[in-house]
Regions:
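Solvent-exposed alpha-helices and their adjacent loops that cap or buttress functional pockets
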Residues: 18-22, 42-45, 62-66, 77-81, ...
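Conserved PLP-binding catalytic core of the aspartate aminotransferase-like
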Residues: 167-192
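A short secondary-structure junction signal
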Residues: 10-13, 37-42, 60-66, 82-85, ...
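Active-site C-terminal subdomain of aminotransferase-like
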Residues: 75-157, 171
């Protein structure tokens, strides 16, 4: 089974492979999928609002937020402690929730109350503030991108130059910079 998987190259779909259903309200994608280590190396171009889960690569590379309808990211990967979520939403997409949507899941609620509908998680916000200060002091998002490319490439080079001892079956340009996934060619060793 491992040999079969090793021969199957995984990748993000190409732009021309994206099929948006007529009448679709939006296109959702996860910019960096952590289980298999697959990242979108491009931003999909579509004629509907683009919704992105950037939980695992938030603040790891420059992003033109004007190209998105909504971006959300759980802070626990790159921005702060678990329990804090960042949402960047285009104003024209607010106020469209179904009547059955709970108040706490309606982004319009947070916009109306400047993100303080309920007691803000002050400790989580404080930690995220410290992360932002550190990130800026280190050179900002472009520096984080440079570092993630450098670090991940060192690991991918070790995998690719292991004479088959390790393998990664992700197309090179779809390889995650945030989490490098690999296996051992010998399935018995994977079980240890």
């Amino acid at each position: 089974e491992a040999a079969e998987v090793a021969c199957t190259e995984l990748r993000a779909p190409r732009q021309d492979e994206l099929a948006v259903t007529d009448g679709a309200a939006y296109l959702y994608y996860c910019s960096n999928e952590t289980v298999n280590g697959i990242r979108y190396w491009y931003r999909p171009e579509v004629n509907v609002p683009l919704i992105a889960d950037m939980s695992s690569d938030f603040l790891s590379q420059p992003v033109d937020i004007s190209k998105y309808g909504l971006i959300f990211a759980g802070a626990q990967k790159n921005f702060g402690p678990a329990g804090l979520t960042v949402v960047i939403a285009r104003k024209d997409l607010l106020g469209r929730a179904e009547s059955t949507t709970p108040t706490m899941l309606d982004y319009q609620t947070y916009a109306n109350f400047e993100s303080m509908y309920n007691t803000p998680p002050t400790f989580a916000i404080y930690i995220s503030h410290l992360v932002c200060k550190w990130l800026l002091a280190e050179g900002g998002v472009k520096e984080m991108e440079r570092r993630s490319i450098l670090k991940s490439q060192k690991i991918y080079d070790a995998i690719d130059n292991s004479d088959g001892f390790y393998y990664n079956n992700i197309e090179k340009r779809s390889r995650s910079r945030m989490n490098v996934v690999f296996n051992l060619k010998n399935e018995e060793l994977n079980q240890l």
